[in-house]
Amino acid sequence: MAAAGLVAVVAAAEYSGPVASGGNLSGATCGPSPGLGPGPGPGSWSRSVDRALEEAAVTGVLSLSGRKLREFPRGAANHDLTDTTRADLSRNRLSEIPMEACHFVSLESLNLYQNCIRYIPEAVLNLQALTFLNISRNQLSTLPVHLCNLPLKVLIASNNKLVSLPEEIGHLRHLTELDVSCNEIQTVPSQIGNLEALRDFNVRRNHLLRLPEELAEVPLIRLDFSCNKITVIPVCYRNLRHLQVITLDNNPLQSPPAQICIKGKIHIFKYLNIQACKIAPDLPDYERRPLGFGSCHEELYSGRPYGALDSGFNSVDSGDKRWSGNEPTDEFSDLPLRVAEITKEQRLRRESQYQENRSSVAVTNGGVEHDLDQIDYIDSCTTEEEENDVKQPKSLDTNSLSSQFMAYIEQRRISHEVSPVKPIAVREFQKTEDMKRYSHQNRVPVEPSLVLSMPPSHNQLSHSDLELHQRREQSIECTRREAQLAALQYEEEKIRTKQIQRDAVLDFVKQKASHNPQRQQPPGNGECSFPSRRSQHTDDSALLVSLSGLDGVSCVATRPHSSAFTPLKSENRVDVTSSFPMTETVHHSPAYSFPAATQRNQPQRPESFLFRAAVRAEANKGRASPLLLSSAPATDPTDAITRQREEELKLIDQLRKHIEYRLKVSLPCDLGAALTDGVVLCHLANHVRPRSVPSIHVPSPAVPKLTMAKCRRNVENFLDACRKIGVPQEQLCLPLHILEEKGLGQVAVTVQALLELAPPKQPPPQQPQQQQPQLSAV
């Protein structure tokens, strides 16, 4: 008993805290021990150091937390603590790791949280069973090298004064958690990539400028590098496929930008994957795909529902306020343009390869050129009208052509500086030259004995090549003869057609002078008929009825009157586009309407686009005065085009004045671009008849440009409103006239017809104007 009392007195002398009342010398407080589970209960505050040592000898758990000890208790020498596995010396005033604790060879967990430790002795190497070490909230400036030779699994060194990590940190092969947050670390050594078992890495609140790329080789689950000076996340971090939590707030990040980082981990890794594809464009497809994540369902803000983390893909809501001002909002609205560019590049690449290998590649499709497979044939053959349509500028007539054909023409015009459908002479010349090259390269003189000694398969191949060449030569010769025949017949028909035109103009003038200008059917005259199909002997020149210069000859050109001359025979046909190019036209007079008989017989007309082109061209010519045509039947096409262009400009100017006057707005110089989204036109329709367009898609400050789908919806709503108000169908423009800015003249006709149906505006009251002079006189 005396010895026990002496130990208690010595412990009390070592303890510098207050002494409990009643003579109890073990009144030191004992707080909870972080890292070692729940601390002792309230009754432990009165336990003596001696009882703590006795319990450590029995249980193997030493708890001396919160006793303000400056050194290890000396009474520990009286107890066998060699089997201690867990030691809690936190919340004391120790300046170094006690030497007594370094001899606990069975120690697995050591907690030195919140002390004054500045040095770790080398004797710590004796703790070869230590797996958990908490030295946070101390005054360490460096981690000693010998600390990296321990079998640690958890190392917590936060809230110290560390300026760097030792390169030997890579020796901690079994380390799963490393916490060095709240220090002054400026760089992380590349050897951290050797920590093949690391799962949790926390470098929060340091002075890091960059992240080591070697960290991408570590199977991290949690990464926290917030509150640093990091500007770029390495692209290789996309390989962190096991990462579930990444915390990166309070960093001046530039790549990925902040708009992507706030959306969460999924978007960050998508961005890194896209950047990797840009850096290495030759990556195979399977490496371009984003890597999967193992059980990866958490985001940056775990309490936030995942549905709110919208990527913005396919988002066309113009009122969305999630986008920042400097983030592109119409990044995906031009997807068709990107697809078109990709298709163009692929096509050009294929054609260049074909041109290089053209002389050495055997064609097996019966003598047809390989590049002709890329041509979308219309009416089963390629015509001169098609070639001319490709070469004409954008101001060509689009009213008579289908949208599919116009898209086809535009695609060919963009993808080729020179049209792949070459003129006949050039195309045949190239075929002949290719055949000559092929013949010189492949026809090598051989001896008959060698031919007999060749295997049968080789002989069959040679015979097939010869037959193929013969078929190609025959087809070329046949095509050449047909082209020459077509050219001769074209000249003859051109002469005959001019004579027919003069006679028809004279007949029309006589008929107009003798008949009432009202619409009537002259007796004995049928409607104007057109050939239902082209001549069978032509392949490269389509021969149609040339109605150029005939005002009143065509059923479409003379809408108030019927045609007055007999149908033309099939041989009296000529290429319309060769003499008069088609131009984009508008209907000038809203009072014109098609005859009922023409509408009844409309399904019997041929469906060829060439027929529609001829009809449209003659509709343009029909607006000229018959007297002028009778006096000068052979008018210069250039003058007609110039005249039509001037009329179109007048219509466009009139359209601008109408809109500005009705809506009290000032339109920009580019009127077509101002009307493309359909907003102005929808407001104009509502001005004529309120609520005729119930909903209008308008731009917003966040999304200043409407998507093509919303622009088309506005335009279609405007045209529907025009139909409901009463605009005739023949005066309605097409949506592509507005969306593609290719038919402002037709839009002007539609707007003019719409405004004619508007109620007359009441004149402003005159009373204030009459009183104004009286007031000024007073």
UniProtKB/Swiss-Prot annotation:
Record keyword Repeat present: yes
Entry-linked SMART domains: CH (SM00033), LRR_BAC (SM00364), LRR_TYP (SM00369)
Superkingdom in the source lineage: Eukaryota
Species this protein is from: Mus musculus
Annotated region described as Disordered, given as residue ranges: 511-536, 758-778
Annotated Low complexity bias: 768-778
GO biological process: septin cytoskeleton organization
Gene designation: Lrch3
Database matches in InterPro entries: CH_dom, CH_dom_sf, Leu-rich_rpt, Leu-rich_rpt_typical-subtyp, LRR_dom_sf, LRR_domain-containing
LRR repeats: 56-79, 81-104, 105-127, 128-150, 152-172, 173-195, 197-218, 220-239, 240-264, 266-290
This protein's name: DISP complex protein LRCH3
Compositionally biased residues, Polar residues: 514-523
